[in-house]
Each structure stands twice: as C-alpha cells, then as structure tokens.
C-alpha cells in the first residue's frame, strides 16, 4: 500500500510513486518568493545585479548582502533563504582556499560550483545530523579562470548549468524572456551592466536606487560596486 502524499512530503530522501522528491520541489518553489537576481556573461567578464528588499526605513541597506565573494576570481548572487546561501558560500570559500593551498593555483569556477552542489545534495555537512531539508536557495556563480569568464546557475536539487545569461527569484520569468531578447555574444561589460539593471528595473516594484540594488562584476577579479558606481549605472538607463 502506498504512503499518503503527506508522508512523501516529509521524507526528504523518499521518492513518491511518480518518482518525485516533494521537499526538493518545494525548495525550488521557495526561490520564486525571493528577490530577483540577474547574471550576464560577456567576453570581458560577468555582471551580477540583484534587488535588495529594504523592508523598513530603519534597516541599514549596506547590511543586506545579496552578492558575496567566494574567491578573488569568483562571486555569487543569491535568491531564497540567505542563511542557507551563507552556509553554501562558507563551504565554497573553504574549498577554494584549500585548493589554492594544496595546488598553488586558483580553483576553476566549474570545480567550485561542483563542490557547492555536492553539499547541496547532502543537505548539510559534518558528523552532526544532516539538515532535514534541502537548501532553499538558488545561486548565480560568476567567475573568471583559465577558460575565460563563466556563469553558472545552481538550484536546491544540487543541479548546475552553465549559462550566458540567467535570472532567478520572484521576477525571473519576465527577466529571463527579456534577457533572451537582449543578449548577444558581443556585448561589452558596460552594456551588460545597463541591460541587467534595466531588466531589474522592469521587474522591481519600486524605483531603482543605489540602496535597493547591488551590482558586482568579475573581470577578471571580483568587484562589488560602491553606491556611487551603482548611481553611475542608474544614470545611464
């Protein structure tokens, strides 16, 4: 006799008779509630742009981190549960530093993404009890290594894809279709900044300001834009 749907819902390691892992599917749905993040790859480097939801005028905007540095040549933007993202980013930072220490060279972007997804698939690490649920976060990982610039997208199932452009979060459907229309392989980094921010402006419910968006680039090293640099990109829209 089959278990009820609710019992399949609870078991993170139990497939339903239709071959589905409901907890992973729910985690993927949770990301659609998160703030929108956009990544765009060019020949010069990769641009990341993220919406920051400032829920109260008492909140310090600089404390809301939606783009983080993993290594000097890799950065990542996130949508979903930020605490989960922090766990994954910390793991990736340790992996990249261990690789640099052991081999005397930076870790490739693909290997870093693979290490992140291995952890996502285990739902946690260490000898303590593993997490009882998947990580409720999607990441856009931007990097620059011996293979040139690259952009990867990860989801809670531990799957990753390499992309030229990708949007995640609540406005991802509209943003993805706009990216498809505007992307071409000959974009400059400056054009990519403008496109990413203009698409973000379309899907955001409020006016774009340096306080409610973050922009970063990896070209070839990671750089998070200052509020005045973000203002300069906004003025070009």
Swiss-Prot record:
Gene Ontology cellular component annotations, sorted alphabetically: cytoplasm; nucleus; proteasome core complex, alpha-subunit complex
Alphabetized UniProt keyword annotations: Cytoplasm, Nucleus, Proteasome
Record keyword Nucleus present: yes
Domain of life: Eukaryota
Compartments, as annotated in UniProt: Cytoplasm; Nucleus
GO biological process, one term: proteasome-mediated ubiquitin-dependent protein catabolic process
Gene3D superfamilies: Glutamine Phosphoribosylpyrophosphate, subunit 1, domain 1
Protein task: The proteasome is a multicatalytic proteinase complex which is characterized by its ability to cleave peptides with Arg, Phe, Tyr, Leu, and Glu adjacent to the leaving group at neutral or slightly basic pH. The proteasome has an ATP-dependent proteolytic activity.
Family membership: Belongs to the peptidase T1A family.
Protein name stated in the entry: Proteasome subunit alpha type-5
Source species of the chain: Glycine max (Soybean)
Name of the gene: PAE1
């Amino acid at each position: 006799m089959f278990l009820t749907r609710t019992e399949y819902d609870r078991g993170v390691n139990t497939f339903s008779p239709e071959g589905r892992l409901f907890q992973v599917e729910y985690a993927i749905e949770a990301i659609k509630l998160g703030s929108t993040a956009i990544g765009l790859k060019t020949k010069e480097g990769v641009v990341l742009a993220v919406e920051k939801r400032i829920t109260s005028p008492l909140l310090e905007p600089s404390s809301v981190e939606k783009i983080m540095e993993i290594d000097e040549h890799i950065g990542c933007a996130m949508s979903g549960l930020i605490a989960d993202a922090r766990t994954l980013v910390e793991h990736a930072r340790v992996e990249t530093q261990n690789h640099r220490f052991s081999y005397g060279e930076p870790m490739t972007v693909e290997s870093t993404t693979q290490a992140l997804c291995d952890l996502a698939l285990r739902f946690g690490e260490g000898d303590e009890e593993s997490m009882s649920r998947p990580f409720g976060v999607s990441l856009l990982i931007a990097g620059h290594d011996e293979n040139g610039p690259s952009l990867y997208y990860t989801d809670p199932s531990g799957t990753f894809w390499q992309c030229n452009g990708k949007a995640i979060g609540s406005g991802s459907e509209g943003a993805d279709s706009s990216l498809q229309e505007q992307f071409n392989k000959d974009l400059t980094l400056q054009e990519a900044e403008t496109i990413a921010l203009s698409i973000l402006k379309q899907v955001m419910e409020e006016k774009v300001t340096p306080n409610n968006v973050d922009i970063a680039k990896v070209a070839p090293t990671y750089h998070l834009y200052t509020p005045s640099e973000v203002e300069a990109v906004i003025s070009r829209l």
